[in-house]
Amino acid sequence: AQAPGITEAQVKRPFNASSGTRLFQWLARAGLEEAEFRRRYYMTAVTKCYPGKHPKGKGDRKPTGAEQKLCRPFLEREIELVRPRAILAVGGLAIETVLGRKVRLEEAVGQAFEVDGRLVLPLPHPSGASLWLNRPENQACLARALGILKEELLPLIEA
């Protein structure tokens, strides 16, 4: 995720609000139930503080480049300490950060990447503010990604 939302910042639990409901519905399609996922896997965000509402009122504001740069050492240290075999990158900013380059969601979601010896699986952000999933071809990208999660990622991380 790019940053905690207001609810997540208050309760200190990632994907705690409506975006979380949608994300965990997706993960359930791949065989991962929310309670088990939260118990077994580490969740973090590119930035660590709630960035505030988007000026146009559609969701939360994207963290600035300066905010991302300030938080980058913390994210890198988290990855160093956790040493994940795989990373589920949720949302455009998380995907861009983990892959180290800009990439269109249509080109990333539904594909697996290898970065620093880790399997990276991009997912779109589950925010209701995102219109990306309104297109049937993008729903197909998400379905492919969830298939990769079930068939490739889960066996890898549970080995």
Regions found by a protein language model. Give the residues of each.
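A polyanion-binding, active-site-adjacent surface
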Residues: 2-158
